[in-house]
Swiss-Prot record:
Pfam families: Enolase_C (PF00113), Enolase_N (PF03952). The gene is eno. This is Enolase. The keyword Metal-binding applies. Pathway: Carbohydrate degradation; glycolysis; pyruvate from D-glyceraldehyde 3-phosphate: step 4/5. It catalyses: (2R)-2-phosphoglycerate = phosphoenolpyruvate + H2O. (2R)-2-phosphoglycerate binds at Q163, K337, R366, S367, K388. GO terms for molecular function: magnesium ion binding; phosphopyruvate hydratase activity. The active site is at E205, K337. One of its GO terms (biological process) is glycolytic process.
Length: 427
């Protein structure tokens, strides 16, 4: 019934107009699972490898025909006839077939596309939603959204060094109310930026990308928008940052090009602690560079008891790197990006390890996305309590929010919104 009879890979476009991989997995009973693979702009050096063609005469070298050929050829040859219910074994076969530590030969984009499509096909075969198939009967928690409403860094053409300024509607009673809160703040922010003479073009993740001089300026606009929209900062809505500090870490220091300032490792830790003291910031992602291990420890020691410190480039959804961070007291949370590691099995293992160690986990999109909403289901399946999937604009972002609305409606009275319980500092 659930034997794999066909695997079809194709090249499609992501939200930035770059090629990416889409995969259909067809089962013996006619069930079909489809998955499209995202792509990042600020990528960690330790991520699994995204296979690109390198032919400059086609899509500027970013084509994914090699990955598609691997899907339709070598990978299908190995997986054809296997049972789609055997997710772990299927993922293990692909990892072994690739034979490299970072999936560089066949490509994490090829392997992930199949891995996710297999799970979706199996869920379809059982006539179950994906969150229920992956998460079982306990999957019922709707995540607090981290809504990226001001973009900077690698996600926008403006002087702001930090990559994302986010709102978290922790005070809402339901996911649908949280989404409404975020949307109202988003539109209020647009009006406030316009009034102040700033452009309201949006960045890669749907947030605004105004020419603001500093993080303080961006945070002040967000605070004003929250209040003007009728909500209380620090009570109804909290703030979160993604510094993406690896991008401006040079020669052992943090170089703020937009502010024309350089901060030492200790100054960076103190600066972030100061921001968290002056604003209702409850989560800071990648506040230190991916290889600045001393900096991560210092930051965790200073603010880790009061603030969620999320490792993205630091951990790259990799259990080996996460285990090292847990052992050495670096960060207290992990960002979960399926394409950083390349299989569903390894993704779920990272969430499980984090939860067992008392770390939180945040399910996340990438800046180059598609209409695929798999991560919405995975957020509920893992009961991780937080999701980061962009702003309240662009269909590649709202597709995930809309899927969460559907899931909440389907769960009915069983649905539970994570709210303040998602963040240890607010419990």
């Amino acid at each position: 019934m659930t034997a794999i009879v066909d695997i079809i890979g194709r090249e499609i476009l992501d939200s930035r107009g770059n090629p990416t991989v889409e995969v259909d997995v067809v089962l013996e009973d006619g069930a079909v699972g489809r998955a499209a693979v995202p792509s990042g702009a600020s990528t960690g050096a330790h991520e699994a490898v995204e296979l690109r063609d390198g032919d400059k005469g086609r899509y500027g070298g970013k084509g994914v025909q090699k990955a598609v050929e691997a899907i339709n050829g070598e990978l299908f040859d190995a997986l054809g006839g296997m049972d789609a219910e055997s997710q772990v074994q299927i993922d293990e076969v692909m990892i072994a077939l690739d034979g490299t530590p970072n999936k560089a030969r066949l490509g994490a984009n090829a392997i992930l596309g199949i891995s996710l499509a297999v799970a979706k096909a199996a869920a379809e075969s059982y006539d179950m939603p994906l969150y229920r198939y992956v998460g079982g009967t306990s999957a019922r928690m709707l995540p607090v959204p981290m809504m990226n409403i001001i973009n900077g860094g690698m996600h926008a053409d403006n002087p702001i060094d930090f990559q994302e300024f986010m709102i978290m509607p922790v005070g809402a009673d339901s996911f649908s109310e949280a989404l409404r809160c975020g949307a109202e703040i988003f539109h209020t922010l647009k009006s406030e930026l316009k009034k102040a003479g700033h452009n309201t073009n949006v960045g890669d993740e749907g947030g605004f990308a105004p020419n603001l001089p500093s993080a303080d300026a961006a945070l002040d606009f967000v605070m004003a928008a929250i209040t003007k929209a009728g909500y209380k900062p620090g009570e109804d809505v909290m703030l979160a940052l993604d510094c993406a500090a690896t991008e401006f870490f040079k020669d052992g220091a943090y170089v703020y090009g937009g502010e024309n300032k350089t901060r030492s490792v200790s100054e960076q830790a103190k600066y972030l602690a100061d921001l968290a003291a002056r604003y209702p910031i409850v989560s800071i992602e990648d506040g230190m560079s991916e290889d600045d291990m001393d900096g991560w420890k210092e930051l965790t020691d200073i603010v880790g008891s009061k603030c969620q410190l999320v490792g993205d480039d630091l951990f790259v959804t990799n259990v080996t790197r996460l285990a090292d961070g847990i052992k050495n007291g670096r960060a207290n949370s992990i960002l979960i990006k399926v394409n950083q590691i390349g299989t569903l099995t390894e993704t779920l293992a990272a969430v499980e390890m984090a939860h067992k160690a008392g770390y939180t986990a945040v399910m996340s999109h990438r800046s180059g996305e598609t209409e695929d909403s798999t991560i919405a289901d995975l957020a509920v399946a893992t009961n991780c309590g937080q999701i980061k999937t962009g702003s309240l604009a662009r269909a590649d972002r709202t597709s995930k929010y809309n899927q969460l609305l559907r899931i909440e409606q389907e769960l009915g009275s069983q649905a539970l919104y994570a709210g303040k319980a998602a963040l240890k500092a607010l419990r």
